[in-house]
């Protein structure tokens, strides 16, 4: 097969500009996310108490095998009694109006708005970049990968190029865009830090989990009956088996090195 010789202008005016524009868009998206993100509402003492009790029950079910059987049993008794008695529940105001539609709850609306902001900051820039590449650089071959690939990768690396006999190692302009979209996470982490909105946007459509306070607030979704959640969790804790990895651990350790 005859080798292709690429014009150096493709590198200077197509390949590098696409990469630089995507890095710039990622930095702008990160800063726009910070500006548009509303600070999460502070939870009341009673709401935090409810969440912490449920978190303790979840943690016991997940990590019970790291405790001694008597420790597991003691925690089970405490959690079952606390979850069933309802003494950690937030006092309910009998005069407070109940929302007819759970979607009209303030927390639900706030979460939907945050999700819409994140989706907008992800979709709009990528739509603009895709339109720009399709309009000006459609059908361009930009680089050759230094390693061989099978034919299954042809549709991935040669998107927009309708040539059947072209070697799979060649990468088109649109495929170069997608490679940058999912491959610039390390660059964003170097420029913006590990927890940045630029790389998070490619994994999560929205800004959920961007702050620890917001992640904690997602434990109890709006409209859920917390008392029923606690009763259900009490049943889960009650059927938990007292299986511990620490039983006879001394004998197993001595037998291993004997």
Curated annotation (Swiss-Prot):
SMART domains hit by this protein: DUF106 (SM01415)
Keywords: Cytoplasm, Membrane, Transmembrane, Transmembrane helix
GO biological process, one term: protein insertion into ER membrane
Pfam families given in the database record: EMC3_TMCO1 (PF01956)
Principal cellular location given in the protein's record: cytoplasm
Annotated InterPro entries: EMC3 (IPR008568), EMC3/TMCO1 (IPR002809)
Membrane topology type: Multi-pass membrane protein
Cellular component aspect of the GO annotation: cytosol; EMC complex
Annotated localization: Cytoplasm; Membrane
Domain of life: Eukaryota
Transmembrane segments: 8-28, 123-143, 173-193
Family the entry assigns: Belongs to the EMC3 family.
Protein name: ER membrane protein complex subunit 3
């Amino acid at each position: 097969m005859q080798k292709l010789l690429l014009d150096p202008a493709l590198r200077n005016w197509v390949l590098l500009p696409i990469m630089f524009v995507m890095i710039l868009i990622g930095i702008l998206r990160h800063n726009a996310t910070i500006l548009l993100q509303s600070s999460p509402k502070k939870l009341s003492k009673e709401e935090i108490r409810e969440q912490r009790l449920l978190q303790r029950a979840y943690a016991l079910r997940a990590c019970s095998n790291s405790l001694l059987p008597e420790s597991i049993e003691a925690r089970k008794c405490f959690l079952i009694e606390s979850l069933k008695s309802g003494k950690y529940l937030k006092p309910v105001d009998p005069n407070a109006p109940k929302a007819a539609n759970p979607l009209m709850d303030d927390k639900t609306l706030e979460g939907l708005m945050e999700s819409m902001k994140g989706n907008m900051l992800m979709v709009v820039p990528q739509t603009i970049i895709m339109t720009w590449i399709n309009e000006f650089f459609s059908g361009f071959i930009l680089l050759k990968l230094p390693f061989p690939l099978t034919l299954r990768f042809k549709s991935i690396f040669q998107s927009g190029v309708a040539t059947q006999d072209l070697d799979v190692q060649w990468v088109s302009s649109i495929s170069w865009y997608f490679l940058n979209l999912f491959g610039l996470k390390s660059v964003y982490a170097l420029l913006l830090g590990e927890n940045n909105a630029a790389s998070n946007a490619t994994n999560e459509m929205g800004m959920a989990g961007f702050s620890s306070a917001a992640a904690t607030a997602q434990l109890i979704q709006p409209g859920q009956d917390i008392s029923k959640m606690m009763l259900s969790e009490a049943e889960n804790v009650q059927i938990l088996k007292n299986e511990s990895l620490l039983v006879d651990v001394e004998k197993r350790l001595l037998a291993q090195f004997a």
